[in-house]
Amino acid sequence: MRDLDVLRGRGLTREEALLATDLLWEELAQTMKSERASVLEDGSIVVEGVELKFAFTVFGEPVEGKRSLYISLHGGGGTTPEANDKQWENQKKLYKPTEGIYLAPRAPSNDWDLWHKPHIDFLFDYLISTLVVLADVDPNRVYLLGYSAGGDGVYQLAPRMADRWAAAGMMAGHPNDAKPYGLRNIGFTLHMGGQDTAYRRNEVAKEWQDWLGQLQADDPEGYKHWVEIYPQHGHWMEGEDASALPWMAQFKRNPYPKRVVWWQDDVTHTRFYWLAVTAAEAVEGAKVVASVQ
């Protein structure tokens, strides 16, 4: 039985529900393939009037027919378009995973908070789903990383979009108002120069190291993390931060974890893993801790 119409209008068994999920995905994927066929060649997506340009390189061979995806965020921010373009060019070649699609997007804006504006969330959702359909990306092996202002973005996006990531790597950034609660079910690594004193980045990295350590002590099944502070380095870590990639690669996303910690950032969401709320209930600062047996 491969017909959705047969399943409509009645309750479903567990097996039928799984089948319906597969059928709905097949139908959606076919539509997406048709509508987004030129995206990879164009190197650009537009969602709700906001454009995100990107460039990518493919490394290694697929694993069981699927590829990992590394989304790597450039630095800059709060400067000229030309300066941010230069940062983007640098980010395109900054890291080299052993396997997967290494994709460096160009932030749509040139503001200081270029990677944690509200439009970034829906752009990345669209980007990930496109690569799942068009480039055989494994949705459970999607990784986020970023340097400097890109690291600022990772601090923000890793917890608030944690249900999309397997792991995330923050390099040389500052969290601003971000909190780590949503990181419960992903791997999170933080790399910082011990002499990176601007905006107290080095001190804040140590605070997050302690914070993550306490979260894991209180919840030993969650908050897997690795923090590396290099005492000899300032803002530039001379490539030592690339050690984050093989550490991240050991993680796979669990779409249905038994325990979820959901913190609403200033950019709110109406769903997180298997939880959902109405738009009216998605309030900044709300925290939900939910478990299933």
Model-predicted segments: where are they?
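A domain-start/cap signature at the N-terminus of enzymes
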Residues: M1-S68
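Gly/Ser-rich "nucleophile elbow"/oxyanion-hole loop immediately N-terminal to the catalytic nucleophile
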Residues: G60-G65, D113-A149, R160-R164
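Loop/turn elements at helix/coil->beta-strand transitions in domains of secreted/extracellular proteins
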Residues: G65-L69, T98-Y102, D138-V142, M161-A167, ...
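Active-site machinery of serine-nucleophile hydrolases
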Residues: K66-V133
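Acidic beta-to-alpha connecting loop that harbors the catalytic carboxylate
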Residues: G76, A107-P108, G194-T197, Q232-H233
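Primarily recognizes the serine-hydrolase "nucleophile elbow" in alpha/beta-hydrolase
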Residues: N140-R184
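Short beta-strand/loop motif that positions the catalytic acidic residue
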Residues: T189-G193
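C-terminal catalytic histidine-bearing segment of alpha/beta-hydrolase fold enzymes
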Residues: T197, E203-Q293
